[in-house]
Structure formats: C-alpha cells, structure tokens
C-alpha cells in the first residue's frame, strides 16, 4: 500500500470511506512527519491532539454511516486564520500569545466538513512578503534543493510559505492559504504544488487577520487540481459577517472537473512576454500552450495593455489598506503591549508598534500612510485606483475573445534565502505575473508544469473570468494530466 502521507486528499477521503485505513492511522502518520520536520520550520504551532480528535470523530462517523465531505482528512491552517483556543499570530511578535475565542468562517467550514487540524502554518508577517523571510518565528525553508550538489537553503515563496513547504514535504495533504497579490500562487509554483485563489468574495474573510481588505482572498493549496477543487468546495460560501462575501451558491467543482477543453479558447497575453525573462520560464510557457492545444483548446494572442502599471498600483493600494488595517494594533486591547516606565499613551503606542512590527510591515505601513496623506492622496492613491479600474477593464475586454488566460506564475524558480532581502524592489518584482489578477479580483490558479535546469519546480498560471473557477480548474487539470509532474524534493530534513 502507498505510504499514507503520500496520498492526496481525494485518496484519503475515498480510502477512509472504503475502510482501507482508519482516520486515526492517517492523522498519526502526518503527525509523525510534522514532528520529524522541524528543520523546515513550516509550523508555528503543532496541534497533533486536535488532528487525532477529528480523526476519531471521522472513524465514528464512518461506523455510524454519517461521513462528511472531508472526514479523515487532516490539513494545515495558515496562521492568519483565527482558530478558537489555538494561538493565532499572523507570524508577528505583535500577536504572539494571542488566542482567539472564536473561529474564522473558512476554518469553521472545514471543521464542519470533517477535516482535522495538524497545526498553524508559518507565513510572512501579516502576509506581507514573497519569501517567508519576514516571519517573526523564523524563515520557512523549502524542502527543495538545487541539483548543483550544494545545499543552499531556498525560499518556499510567500506569504503562504509554511503551507507550500508543508504540502511539498508531505507534512499535510492540503492547507489553507491567502492570496493578496500572489501569496497562494507563487509559493505553490516554488514548491511544485497546486493552489487556487478564487474570485474575490468566494471565501469569507471573516476571522482572517486583515492585510489589504479589497484584495485578500482565502484559497486552498494541495498537490493536485482535484484536491484544490475538493478543498475549495468546503471553504467557499456566502457569509453575512463579511460585507464583501458573494451571495452565490457553491458549485460542485470536483464533480464537473474535465480536462477536455474542446470549444474553449485560451488567451496568451503579449505583455507578459517580458524582456530578459528566464529562458526556462519561456520554454515552460510554450510547453503549456502546446498542452492546452492538445486538450483541444484554441489559442489566441491577447493584449492587456495596462499590465506594466499593475505592480506600482498594487504597491500603493495594498500598503494603503495595510496602514489602515494595522492601526488597530495599539497595545490597548490585545496583542503586545510595551509600556515604558512613566510613559504616556502616545509613548505606549509608539513603543508597542516599534517593538511588535517587523521591518517589512513597518515599510508598508509607512508607504501606506504616505500615499494616504493629505498632500499625496490624489497623486498616488486616487491614481492607483484608476489604474486598477483600467486593469480590470483590460481583462474584461480580453475575455471577450477567450475563456481563460495562460501565463507563468512567477518570473523565476525559487531563489535562495537572503538573495533578495536587501532589495525590496527586486522582491516586489516577484509578484509581476500574479498581481494583475488580484487587482481585478479574478480566479487564478498555479499548477506545477516543469523543472528548470537547476531541478527546481516551475508553475503555470491560469486566470479565469469572474466566478469561473470551473474553467480555471479544468484548464489546470488539462495541464496537470499532460505535464505529468511527479517530481518531489529529496528528503534532507
């Protein structure tokens, strides 16, 4: 029998249902992998007891004939989702020791569906970063290594780097992520797994620590497209507690999965053909186009003329919203409090925020405060919002002639830890292909498609029309079946 930790979500669900193994056996196997993988630093909090508790309930449900959609499936929870009675930190010193007395909507939906929690996964602090190097609890280290014989530590991507590393290393079969400007898709591409950011509003933001409210969107990460569909079905749905939640029924994405793209048209954006891009990325993209043609899709070139303005607009809008959202961390009600001897209220605010926030978070708060200030609001923030509208219109026009768009997920494979930390702009450029879909609120998915010449995974991105997660998943499945990506990191941890 295949080792239990090598099974996908679908295989665990179906195998447990058929009585091939117990949920407790599965939970114990993953708990053991988590305990043995401290070197990856993927988890901030481990919750083996909760995983076993849910597994026992799943086994009881099987005996009683009352199985749920995710009975027997243990998962990882990004530590941005509030979990009742379990520390939730957003990987920041500011929230170290914060234990919520309530459950986020998305995590509650997953527990209601029968899933169990293996632990809270590491991330970039307040989800701000592309390498998982901004976490107060230390870097997550990718399970992947270059094939050059060296052992340089690589970034797992960010901000959902704990999620991507844990799935790639078989510490969990699936995990939650959040995506503000690529934080599900880019780490998925870096570690050879799949991840989907659904249409903005598909998954409730209630109980997720906020970064940029008009962009933040929860989504699943897993090893296969089918697993992402299964997870997303159990995460999505209308929530009256979230003002931006979509009041739409949740489709049965898994049942409708099909890699036959007959009658579908795939758009290839000419503006994404960047000068000087890594030739391995270009080759993978061309191979992806051939795969979709093989799936009977028509392929057309499209134009997204305002693409070059997406990154600058994003790095105005997201920090502006972050500076507003993070104003709540003042040391008064919860989280860290730094009260110097004889200090007044203003001193406490300053000391608490100086101590609690990391350098990248402070950088974004300062950028955000600057672009929202009276003298610069119109010059920066208002203009960025206009650009955002133009980008959304570009996509709308492009979707007049195609059903989905194919592009690379990231401009490179995983880079070494520390390689880009000295230059924030080089780090921000990593989001160049991911940010446009976020600004337009579109569903977008990364699927592993190839290894580069260094033996590292590369991901292809599929962007869909609003609410058409099915189209995105189907194109992803077509790539998955044809790419035949089965590579996994050699165990060194």
From Swiss-Prot:
**Pfam families, per database record:** Amidase
Q: Which UniProt keywords apply?
A: ATP-binding, Ligase, Nucleotide-binding, Protein biosynthesis
> What's its EC?
6.3.5.7
GO CC terms in record: glutamyl-tRNA(Gln) amidotransferase complex
**Has the keyword Nucleotide-binding been applied to this entry?**
yes
The catalysed reaction is:
L-glutamyl-tRNA(Gln) + L-glutamine + ATP + H2O = L-glutaminyl-tRNA(Gln) + L-glutamate + ADP + phosphate + H(+)
Q: Name one GO molecular function term.
A: glutaminyl-tRNA synthase (glutamine-hydrolyzing) activity
At the top level, the lineage of the source is Bacteria
Q: Where is the active site?
A: 78 (charge relay system), 159 (charge relay system), 183 (acyl-ester intermediate)
Enzyme class, spelled out: ligase
> What biological-process GO terms show up in the record?
translation
Question: Is the Protein biosynthesis keyword given for this protein?
Answer: yes
- Disulphide bonds annotated for this chain are none
Task performed by this protein: Allows the formation of correctly charged Gln-tRNA(Gln) through the transamidation of misacylated Glu-tRNA(Gln) in organisms which lack glutaminyl-tRNA synthetase. The reaction takes place in the presence of glutamine and ATP through an activated gamma-phospho-Glu-tRNA(Gln).
Show the HAMAP family listed in the entry.
GatA
Assembly and binders: Heterotrimer of A, B and C subunits.
Say which family it is in: Belongs to the amidase family. GatA subfamily.
The protein's name is Glutamyl-tRNA(Gln) amidotransferase subunit A
According to its UniProt entry, this protein's organism is Sphingopyxis alaskensis (strain DSM 13593 / LMG 18877 / RB2256) (Sphingomonas alaskensis)
């Amino acid at each position: 029998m295949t080792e239990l930790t090598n099974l996908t979500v679908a295989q665990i669900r179906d195998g447990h249902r058929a009585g091939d193994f117990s949920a407790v056996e599965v939970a114990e196997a993953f708990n053991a992998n988590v305990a043995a993988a401290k070197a990856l630093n993927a988890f901030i909090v481990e919750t083996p007891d909760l995983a076993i508790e849910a597994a026992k309930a799943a086994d009881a449900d099987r005996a009683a004939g009352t199985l749920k959609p995710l009975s027997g499936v243990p998962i990882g929870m990004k530590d941005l989702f509030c979990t009742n009675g379990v520390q939730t930190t957003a990987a920041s010193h500011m929230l170290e020791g914060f234990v919520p007395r309530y459950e986020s909507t998305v995590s509650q939906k997953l527990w209601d569906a029968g899933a169990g929690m293996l632990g809270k996964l590491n991330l970039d602090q307040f989800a701000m970063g592309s390498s998982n190097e901004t976490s107060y609890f230390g870097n997550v280290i990718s399970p992947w290594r270059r094939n050059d014989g060296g052992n340089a530590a690589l970034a797992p991507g960010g901000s959902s780097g704990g999620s991507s590393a844990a799935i790639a290393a078989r510490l969990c079969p699936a995990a939650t992520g959040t995506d503000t400007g690529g934080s599900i898709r880019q780490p998925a591409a870096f570690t050879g797994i799949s991840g989907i950011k659904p249409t903005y509003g598909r998954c409730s933001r209630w109980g997720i620590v906020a970064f940029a409210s008009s962009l933040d969107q929860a989504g699943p990460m897993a090893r296969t497209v089918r697993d992402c569909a299964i997870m997303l079905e159990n995460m999505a749905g209308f929530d009256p507690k979230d003002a931006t939640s979509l009041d739409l029924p949740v489709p049965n994405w898994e049942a409708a999965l099909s890699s036959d793209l007959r009658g579908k048209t795939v758009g290839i954006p000419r503006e994404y053909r960047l000068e000087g891009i890594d030739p391995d990325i270009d080759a993978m993209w061309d191979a992806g186009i051939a795969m979709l043609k093989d799936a009977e899709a028509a392929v057309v070139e499209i134009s997204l003329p305002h693409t070059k303005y997406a990154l600058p607009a994003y790095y105005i809008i997201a920090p502006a919203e972050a500076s507003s959202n993070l104003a709540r961390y003042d040391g008064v009600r919860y989280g860290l409090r730094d009260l110097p001897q004889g200090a007044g209220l203003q001193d406490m605010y300053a000391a608490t925020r100086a101590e609690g926030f990391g350098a990248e978070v402070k950088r974004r708060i300062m950028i955000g405060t600057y672009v929202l200030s009276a003298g610069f609001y119109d010059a920066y923030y208002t203009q960025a919002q206009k650009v955002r509208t133009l980008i959304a219109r570009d996509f709308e026009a492009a979707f007049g002639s195609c059903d989905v768009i194919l592009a690379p997920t990231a401009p490179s494979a995983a880079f070494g830890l520390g390689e880009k930390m000295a230059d924030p702009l080089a780090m921000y450029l990593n989001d160049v292909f991911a940010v446009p879909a976020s600004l337009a609120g579109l569903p977008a998915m990364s699927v592993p498609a190839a290894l580069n010449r260094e033996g590292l995974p590369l991901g292809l991105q599929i962007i869909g029309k609003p609410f058409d997660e099915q189209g995105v998943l189907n194109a992803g499945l077509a790539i998955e079946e044809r790419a035949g990506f089965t590579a996994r990191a050699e165990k060194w941890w």
